[in-house]
Amino acid sequence: GVGLAAGLSFANQKLNDGNISVAIFGDGATSRGIVHECMNLASVWSLPLLFFCENNLYGMSASSSRMISTDSIYKRATEYNMVNFQIDGNDIKQVIETVKKARSIILKEKRPVFIEALTYRQCGHSKSDHLVYRSREEEAYWKAKDPILQYCKSENITLETLNELTKKIEEFGQKELESA
């Protein structure tokens, strides 16, 4: 969690090892005290910490707009004196570039950074979640914005090549699991 990442970033700072820590959490977590406590602490202590919020528009089975008082989660970081970004979390290239930029800021300016990646949860929150709170039109819209398919299209990677890569990754994962 976020608290663990903050602790690790404190260790990174004390060791002066040039590493940063990354806290990855969903939009629902931004309403929890631990996130704000860690954002404050990271800012006060200038911790090498990247806060990466995956805003998938839903907290459990309710729209984020019903659970969060703002439509711009990333702007909350301004109050903690952090550089902050809101990005298209379905654009793999933009995510990579923004994370690289954030890492550079963290190391050069000695301050934490906050990224809000706007994305979509394709599946339910759990196995018992049947997604009755979402429209089929909404799901179709976001399915067309699938990050892997978008990336493959931008890089001219065919579906056949993607399927081959997926198979190799699954085989590798299975071998690793069996040898563990």
Say what each PLM segment does.
Residues 2-178:
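Glycine-rich ThDP/TPP pyrophosphate-binding loop and its adjacent helix/strand module
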